[in-house]
């Protein structure tokens, strides 16, 4: 038995928010993650009253918020864009704290192999600022794994001297995108994992990778979950389903799959 909690990505249901909240509870989720980068959940579109109303809806269904998704789709590799992206990211973190979670997941762009290159330094500067702000709120910007091997990301994070920028661990992304070992990657990033996505996938050639239901891909779940337990992780495995025609069914099956592994 493992101490993990099961979450669901609210947007994966592809339904209006109230209906998606109902489904999240019905399938057996304990928590949820929701995109906060656009639409009605973006910080600029949510008054304090609306934020409280949303949180009340979450709690009334027996759920909590595991994290917000704050991926703005551009990374932090362009010094001309970074000031605006950093400012918006801070507002999303403010929203997260008001919604009683301390994690905002994001993508920063692919960490270069060469620590001496300009892009590496640009990303460092952006992440230093994000980390400092997150530390002030006792919160985390959590970088999603996948664009680079786990060890390279760990080395980058070590240069920041902070857990304000931490990790949202996605085993499928590592497996599909860079052919990394999901279990070994957990040990490489053990100091930084604050949230995880539960997703599975297979490497291939056409297309280069494909998402599949949990347990049907290349993620070795028993080894992966054991590794998370061994590093002391006690947080959320948040189910993210980005494709397929029957998201509710797929998410419910994923909940059952995880329950069978951790209960």
For the regions a language model picked out, list residue spans one by one.
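Acidic/histidine-rich catalytic cores of soluble enzymes
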Residues: 2, 6-8, 31, 68, ...
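Active-site acidic/histidine proton-transfer and metal-coordination neighborhood
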Residues: 16-22, 57-60, 74-167, 176, ...
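A short, acidic, flexible beta-alpha connecting loop/helix-capping segment that sits on the rim
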Residues: 13, 238-247
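Alpha-helix N-cap and loop-to-helix initiation/capping positions
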Residues: 45-53, 80-88, 115-125, 148, ...
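H/E-rich (His + Asp/Glu) clusters that bind or coordinate divalent metals
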Residues: 217-219, 223-224, 229, 235-237
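N-terminal pre-domain/capping segments
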Residues: 1-97, 101, 162, 191, ...
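Hydrophobic residues within beta-strands of alpha/beta enzymes
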Residues: 32-33, 66, 104, 196, ...
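Short secondary-structure boundary segments
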Residues: 36, 108, 200, 241
């Amino acid at each position: 038995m493992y101490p993990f909690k099961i979450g669901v990505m609210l947007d994966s249901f592809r339904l209006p928010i109230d209906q998606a909240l109902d489904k999240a509870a019905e399938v057996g989720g304990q928590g949820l993650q929701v995109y906060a980068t656009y639409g009605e959940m973006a910080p600029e579109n949510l008054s304090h009253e609306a934020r409280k109303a949303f949180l009340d809806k979450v709690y009334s269904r027996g759920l909590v918020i595991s994290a917000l998704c704050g991926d703005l789709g551009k990374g932090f590799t362009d010094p001309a864009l970074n000031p605006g992206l950093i400012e918006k990211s801070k507002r999303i973190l403010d929203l997260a704290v008001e919604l009683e979670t301390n994690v905002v997941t994001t993508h920063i762009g692919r960490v270069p192999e060469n620590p001496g290159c300009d892009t590496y330094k640009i990303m460092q500067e952006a992440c230093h600022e994000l980390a400092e702000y997150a530390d002030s709120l006792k919160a985390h910007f959590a970088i999603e794994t996948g664009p680079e091997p786990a060890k390279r990301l760990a080395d980058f994070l070590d240069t920041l001297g902070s857990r304000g920028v931490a990790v949202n661990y996605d085993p499928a992304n590592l497996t599909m995108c860079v052919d990394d070992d999901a279990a070994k990657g957990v040990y490489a990033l053990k100091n930084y994992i604050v949230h995880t996505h539960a997703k599975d996938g297979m490497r291939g050639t056409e297309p280069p990778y494909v998402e599949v239901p949990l347990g049907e891909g290349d993620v070795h779940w028993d080894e992966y979950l054991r590794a998370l337990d061994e590093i002391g992780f006690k947080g959320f495995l948040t189910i993210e389903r980005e494709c397929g025609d029957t998201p509710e069914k797929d998410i419910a099956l994923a909940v059952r799959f995880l329950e069978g592994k951790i209960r």
